[in-house]
Amino acid sequence: MIKVEHANKTFSGKYGKVHALQDVSIHVEKGDIYGIIGFSGAGKSTLIRLVNGLETLDSGTVTVHGEELGSLKKPQLRKLRRKIGMVFQQFNLLESKTVYHNIALPLILEKVPKAEIDKKVKEVLRFVELEDKKDVYVSQLSGGQKQRVGIARALTTTPDILLCDEATSALDPQTTEAILKLLKKINREMGVTILLITHQMQVVQMICNKVAVMEKGQVVEAGSVLDVFGKPQAPVTKRFVQTVVNDQIPESIISLVKEQKEHFRVERLKFIGSSVKRPVISDICHVEGIVVNILGATVQELQDNIMCVFILPVSYTHLRAHETEADL
């Protein structure tokens, strides 16, 4: 549905050229909620602007619905953009206008008949649960309500792709969760493919099925959320994952184990998906004849799957030559 292949983009800066994107490739399939995560300056916003044709490439290709954007003329590009909705970090609403006017604006600009506009605005207001706010001025709304208006506006053209640029970063945690649930509902009930950028791994954890990690204009890691969370490879990915799944062994636990008379090494056991149902620790005790004490554990839900990380001390006499990590 969305293919970015070997994309390169540079900008002229005060101190010379800035390489915003370097050989970036991603593939978003129909029905995905695909997250692009990275710190500021990683190239996330540039990438998403390429997908809706707001930026052009130096080299590489961007293909949406089988159409290579670089080969389209302006009328063709405008037609394609009608199927792509956009949700912004700072809402981009007309504060002095009503909720109705803001949502209707894309249809007004397209000269859609008034009766059709009324019908569509009513439909999307019901979907985003703002029916009672139709005649309220945007300036009177909360941040979460403003973002719902922004989402409703993006849905008026019946898009099959929704691009979200840090759509929750200006919101409090409770409102963020509500907006993410709404995006998931849009994906599930409307069949809209979502490409979102964020610097919050919790956002990826809650709704994405795939993720690409960006650093300094490059995609350093990409794959299913389960794979990336379960086996992060790049250092920046590990830092992001640790904000959600803390599998680091605290110094206090290491010190506690060192105080014991026996010599122990602290180990991690990681269980993903159906393996959480298996009595692995019980089997270790039975087969190896050792006593295991669980010093710590974390449990996270990832796309209807469970990932558990256990921290436990094991006697040196029963250790393998390498660290235990059971990705079962």
Named regions from a protein language model:
Residues 1, 10-23, 73-76:
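A short, flexible loop at the N-terminus of ABC-type nucleotide-binding domains that lies
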Residues 168, 317-324:
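Conserved small/polar residues in nucleotide/adenosyl-binding loops
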Residues 67-68, 104, 108, 115-132:
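Conserved ABC ATPase "signature" region
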